[in-house]
Amino acid sequence: MPLPDFHVSEPFTLGIELEMQVVNPPGYDLSQDSSMLIDAVKNKITAGEVKHDITESMLELATDVCRDINQAAGQFSAMQKVVLQAAADHHLEICGGGTHPFQKWQRQEVCDNERYQRTLENFGYLIQQATVFGQHVHVGCASGDDAIYLLHGLSRFVPHFIALSAASPYMQGTDTRFASSRPNIFSAFPDNGPMPWVSNWQQFEALFRCLSYTTMIDSIKDLHWDIRPSPHFGTVEVRVMDTPLTLSHAVNMAGLIQATAHWLLTERPFKHQEKDYLLYKFNRFQACRYGLEGVITDPHTGDRRSLTEDTLRLLEKIAPSAHKIGASSAIEALHRQVVSGLNEAQLMRDFVADGGSLIGLVKKHCEIWTGE
């Protein structure tokens, strides 16, 4: 399939996707019933969309194009009520978190969808292992060249986005010692990590043509980069966050990305170059492993900074942009989170350290999602 032309969209508009866990009480393992839930809610959703993701234990909630985080929050809140009622009717529950702490990937059923079945054929068991749960945020751009500039700018802050959203310390019944273990699942994919370097949209079109020569890339959706342009939407899509445990944190993360995008495209503070990516995977690893306690290194100067320090610096820089787009509440909430030193991964570990089981942890996550 050829790459579509870049669809011009209103700059800084927003779209958010949340991959949710469908679980089966009282054991709280992953269920294989997302298709049943989708059928139950599809005629009751008035804004946004509820749809499949890779496996039958995953349920994706997606907003429409939104002006700001308040509109997105309203759509998510309405979807949440409908989905929770349908889940209760079918004796199921819903929760966030980047991984299910004890599910077995061998049990996961890939959705009966042409694209996912083709992906299963290409990637084999890796697709079942990819039963992990992330938040994706789209930001509108006026042109393909703007999208490439924005992608490179946002890539500088991938460690910050990972650290702030880290919510996947447990996997396959084990404490991974990572704050965010979810991104590791994709390390075997040939397109894992950052997009190959291009400096403008014309070069990106040439890159995509080259990738399409393989038998594995049929559309932009087949690429698993941390951040990718989405020409059919006219957006840049950030894909590195764990799904948070609460809607409010998901909305705050979206506000952070929207405000950062506004700052990047209005101020143009960086002259991007390929060397920017020299330590990308090392800095990304620090965020996954240690969260905000990680240390990132500047590839140009060798300077090392804690993610806590650098995240506070980012929040300060983008505060004026956040005010202009109505995202100040998100930046203020994230500032409080960083100063407090709390994150969802540590809260999960604290629950287990206090004597809680992994089954009890999932139950707790379901209660958090419903607001109990």
From Swiss-Prot:
Keywords: ATP-binding, Ligase, Nucleotide-binding. Signal peptide: none annotated. Its EC number is 6.3.2.2. One of its GO terms (molecular function) is ATP binding. InterPro entries: GCL_type2/YbdK_subfam, GCS2, Gln_synth/guanido_kin_cat_dom, YbdK. GO terms for biological process: modified amino acid biosynthetic process. It holds the Pfam family GCS2. Belongs to the glutamate--cysteine ligase type 2 family. YbdK subfamily. PANTHER family: GLUTAMATE--CYSTEINE LIGASE 2-RELATED. Homodimer. NCBIfam families: gshA_cyan_rel, PRK13516.1. This is Putative glutamate--cysteine ligase 2. It comes from Escherichia coli O17:K52:H18 (strain UMN026 / ExPEC).
